[in-house]
């Protein structure tokens, strides 16, 4: 259920790693970050979790094939939502890369259904 008044104390913000929110801001505003996938050939990595920025550029320099990306599966969003609610959030605001470029927004929507969509504000950044 959506709280009558959304505050910093009862609301958590969830973003995907394509937003490139600096770590200091993620920490300051207690944001949770869902990793997009970076794919080099047959190898898939969770952006910023299994592949640092330095590792990304090193792999790119060493690879003959350019990397691609993929949307996070709904389970990654569900994990972030579960963490937010376990830590006391009453409401979750989700901001994703535009649905015109990625299926990330759809993954966020699908995961929200597990918890009751009235507990969410989902914002497609298009």
Where are these regions (language model features)?
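Glycine-rich phosphate/diphosphate-binding loops that line cofactor/substrate pockets in enzymes
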Residues: 4-7, 79-90
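N-terminal glycine-rich anion-binding loop in soluble enzyme alpha/beta folds
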Residues: 12-76
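Short beta-strand segments
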Residues: 15, 94-98, 124
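Conserved beta-strand scaffold positions in the cores of enzyme catalytic domains, especially
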Residues: 33, 94, 120-122
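Short beta->alpha connector loops at strand-helix junctions that form conserved
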Residues: 35-37, 123-126
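Short, charged beta->alpha transition segments
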Residues: 74-84, 107-110
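Short Gly/Thr/Asp-enriched flexible loops that form oxyanion-binding sites at enzyme active sites
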Residues: 96-119
